[in-house]
Amino acid sequence: MNRLKKRTCQFLVLVTTAGLLTGCGGGTPKLEDALKKTAAYEQETVTSPASDTLGGEWTVIALARSGETVDENYFEKYRANLEKRVKDQEGVLSDNRYTEYSRAVMALKSIGKDPTDIGGYDIEKPLEDFDAVVSQGLNGAIYALIALNADDPDANKDGELEQKYLDYILEREKADGGFSLDDNAKDGDVDLTAMTLQSLEPYQDEEDVKEVIDKGVEFLAEIQDDDGGYTAFGAKSSESISQTVIALSAVGVDCNEDERFQKDGKGLYDTLMTFYQKDGSFKHTLDGESNPMATDQGFCALVAYQRYQDKENSFFDMTDYR
C-alpha cells in the first residue's frame, strides 16, 4: 500500500470513528451509548434518591428498568428514604396529590419491593379512594391505573377498581383523539395524550381501547411540529417528546422509524437527542441548560425505546423487574 492510500485509509478510519462518538458534531448518539451515559449521570447527581418528583422516583424507576449496573445499595437508599418520610408523616404522603402514592408504588414495584408494607404502612391502599384520586383530574387516574397494573398487568387489569379508572380515562377522550388535563378544553394536548396511551397499554387487545389508542397515535403524529418536536402551552420542550417516545414504545410504534413521526428524515428519537448533553443529561429547551426533570423524563424515554427495540417488557410492565 503506498503512502497516499495509507493516509487515505487512516483518514477514513478517523472519520468513521468520529461518527460513532457522541457529542456536538458527532451526529445522533447511539441509543445504547446514550442510555449508559445517562444512567451514570443520574447516579452521580442523584446520590440518595428521595421520595419526590425530582431526584427521586423517576430516577429510580428508569434505573431499575434500564438493566444498567447500579450500586447495590442505591435502591435500598430510596426505600429507606421513603420509609422515613412515610413514618414521619404517619402514612400520609399528600392530602390532595395522590400521584405521590402512585409514583412511590411504581418505584417500589420497579425494584421488587412490596408497597403494602413500608414501615408498617400500605401506601397502595390510598389508590382505592377513587374520588380522592380523580380530584386531581385525568393525571391522577392515569398514574393510579399504571401503578395498580405495574407488577402484573394480566392479573390486575380487569379488577373492579382498575376498570373504574379505565372507564374514567376513556370517557375523557376529545373529538380530535387527544386527551387533556382540562375537562373543559376542546382539544387534546401532547403530554396528557401520551401519558394516557401509556396507561392504556395493558388493554390494547380490547377492540374499543385499541381504537382509542390508534386515534391517540394519529393525534400525536398530526400535532407534531415541522421540526419534529412538540409545542405544549406555547413552549417547545424535550419532556413532550420524551412522553411521546414512552407512549409509542408502549403501544408498539417505532418512534424513530414510523413515517408518521419523521420530519426531514429524522424520527422522534433523533429529535429528542437534540436536547441531549455530552454529560448524559437533557435540556428542557434547546437554548437552555441541563434540567433535572428533563433528564429524568429523557432517561425514561431512552429506557422505554431500548426495551421496545429489544422486545422486552414495556417500561411500565414490571413483571420482569430487574
Model region roles, listed by residue range:
Residues 2-5, 22-322:
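Preference for long, amphipathic alpha-helical scaffolds in soluble/luminal domains
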Residues 16-21:
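Hydrophobic core
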Residues 6-14:
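Sec-dependent signal peptide recognition
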